[in-house]
């Protein structure tokens, strides 16, 4: 199959967020992120600036994030800024994004 370079370089990918719970276990929750594909140079540059700048560049949407009352939290820069203070959430998002690179390496 031929490689087709697409103008719109986004993709949806599942994100697992593992948070510590009582009893020495982790609770895992999942949501779907919409990521923007970055070029290697842009990714490397943003990686040195910090998690929030990287998140702002790669995460452009989500589905499946609710508040405590079960209401969906729509994606926004304000919501992203709030979530970026949660180290478990940030780890889940960045792990999911970088995992796509690993899959590309393994398959090629």
Model-assigned labels for residue ranges:
Residues 1-46:
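Short, charged/polar N-terminal "headpieces" of proteins
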Residues 45-108:
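Acidic, low-complexity intrinsically disordered segments
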């Amino acid at each position: 199959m031929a490689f087709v370079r697409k103008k719109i370089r986004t993709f949806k990918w599942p994100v697992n967020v593992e948070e510590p719970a009582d009893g020495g276990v982790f609770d895992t929750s999942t949501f779907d992120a919409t990521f923007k594909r970055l070029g290697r140079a842009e990714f490397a540059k943003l990686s040195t600036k910090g998690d929030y700048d990287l998140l702002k560049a790669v995460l452009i949407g989500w589905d499946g994030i609710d508040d405590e009352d079960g209401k969906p939290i729509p994606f926004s820069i304000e919501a992203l800024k709030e979530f970026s203070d949660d180290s478990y959430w940030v780890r889940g998002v960045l792990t999911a994004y970088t995992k796509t690179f690993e899959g590309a390496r393994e398959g090629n």
